């Protein structure tokens, strides 16, 4: 459903941000 899609998008965004942070460390 829509909620699941939003949850998936949120996980992708968090994962992308985490990857960027790890690259800077």
UniProtKB/Swiss-Prot annotation:
Keywords in alphabetical order: Amidation, Amphibian defense peptide, Antibiotic, Antimicrobial, Secreted
Compartmental location: Secreted
Tissue expression: Expressed by the skin glands.
Principal subcellular localization: secreted
Gene Ontology CC annotation, any one: extracellular region
Example of a GO biological process term: defense response to bacterium
Keyword Lyase: no
List of residues that carry Leucine amide: 25
Superkingdom, taxonomy of origin: Eukaryota
Function: Antibacterial peptide that inhibits reference strains of both Gram-negative bacteria (E.coli, E.cloacae, K.pneumoniae, P.aeruginosa) and Gram-positive bacteria (S.aureus, S.epidermidis, E.faecalis, Streptococcus group B) with relatively low potencies (MIC=25-200 uM). The peptide shows very low hemolytic activity against human erythrocytes. Wheel projection demonstrates the amphipathicity of the alpha-helices is low which may explain the low antibacterial potency.
Family listed: Belongs to the frog skin active peptide (FSAP) family. Ocellatin subfamily.
Name under which the protein is recorded: Ocellatin-P1
Source species taxonomy: Eukaryota, Metazoa, Chordata, Craniata, Vertebrata
């Amino acid at each position: 459903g829509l909620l699941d899609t939003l949850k998936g998008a949120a996980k992708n965004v968090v994962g992308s941000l985490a990857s960027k942070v790890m690259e800077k460390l």
